[in-house]
Amino acid sequence: MSPESKKLFNIIILGVAFMFMFTAFQTCGNVAQTVIRSLNSTDFHGSGYTSMAIIYGVFSASNLITPPVVAIVGPQLSMFASGLFYSMYIAVFNQPFPWSFYTASVFIGIAAAVLWTAQGNCLTINSDEHTIGRNSGIFWALLQSSLFFGNLYVYFAWQGKTQISESDRRTVFIALTVISLVGTVLFFLIRKPDSENVLGEDESSDDQDMEVNESAQNNLTKAVDAFKKSFKLCVTKEMLLLSITTAYTGLELTFFSGVYGTCIGAINKFGAEEKSLIGLSGIFIGIGEILGGSLFGLLSKNNRFGRNPVVLLGILVHFIAFYLIFLNMPGDAPIAPVKGTDSSAYIKSSKEVAILCSFLLGLGDSCFNTQLLSILGFLYSEDSAPAFAIFKFVQSICAAVAFFYSNYLLLHWQLLVMVIFGFFGTLSFFTVEWEAAAFVARGSDYRSI
């Protein structure tokens, strides 16, 4: 197998492994609040929003220390160990107790930080400046396929149900646990790429990331270097500007992955289909994500205009979705009680409009995330692990804040927060992209990014 084929193989395996893991985890997150609302009528008392706030809060803090972990252990073993904790969290839903539920939330927050730092590093060392855009698109499309498969099962399994029984819950979460474990094992198929033509090849700390037989002294040096780089990159102009864009992706991640499905499941006017519509919503979010990731990955080789048009498309699509959701959903839908809400929206609540908005949310999200992955891999090719750690730190802390306020804020206030951050995040991305065009003058084939 040629070096380029080996790198592409690694990217595909990386994407497929994440597809399995996040088929389980994203489906879990999409239905968690609805499942827990049903559980709250028993001896269990908890909140899916609170669990997600814990996960993303711990995730954000842990991102500060994960570059040294990935530098020492390597991305492959880091992702495998993280996958085990993801599987543990999903398994807790089979017989949840408040203490085990929230404890698992803490552990998966740590695991997520390690997982995503290792993913960014693995993506970068298997790419060069000509393939980073393509590889980002391939990975993103495979990752977001996860939204399709798990939610398709939920749609058919929960058809016509207004409450989730213990049998329904266990059937779903046993299957999701097994799927997560399959994805975890797939990380062992990733091969060490040849050292030539890898992004950041001049940086020894990136070249050797997948080496496992190094001296303890060298490991310590790599850990200290990675830790220092994380703090240095935090205060660079480009990273500060991109952090505004990243903050927006954290807010809208919370909305489409946890809040929007809960809103749909709480609207009594949708009748007996309200619970199965949660699964259908997740499917159409996934279709939007897959379409965006595939399209922008294929077009990246011939995109003479850079990343800005894709991000502009993303924010326009999201603003349309937010406006339709504002009109179509009752304001109290995110915080409705177990029995749901009978409140009226500005227009008659439509299932078709709700599902259309799901698609638009997924498409817009793929616009932002594929371009952020691409520009980070390009600008910070020699410091990939610290750069992606900062990216996930900002994204996750904003997601944690959003999950926290989702317990209290009415829908229109949540939408307003996203509109404000989306507007300024788009402007800040444009600024970095325009400055990045200066790489052309230094001989980099910028159009292929």
Swiss-Prot record:
Record InterPro entries: Ion_channel_UNC-93, MFS_trans_sf, UNC-93-like_regulator
Source organism per UniProt: Pongo abelii
Subcellular localization(s) per the UniProt record: Membrane
Highest taxon in the source lineage: Eukaryota
Alphabetical list of Pfam families matching this protein: UNC-93
One term under GO cellular component: membrane
Protein name (Swiss-Prot/TrEMBL): UNC93-like protein MFSD11
Residue numbers bearing the Phosphoserine modification: 204
Main subcellular location of this protein, as a coarse class: membrane
Family, as annotated: Belongs to the unc-93 family.
Transmembrane regions: 8-28, 53-73, 74-94, 96-116, 138-158, 170-190, 239-259, 277-297, 309-329, 359-379, 385-405, 410-430
Keywords associated with the record: Glycoprotein, Membrane, Phosphoprotein, Transmembrane, Transmembrane helix
Topological type in the membrane: Multi-pass membrane protein
Glycosylation sites: 40
Gene3D superfamilies reported in the protein's UniProt record: MFS general substrate transporter like domains (1.20.1250.20)
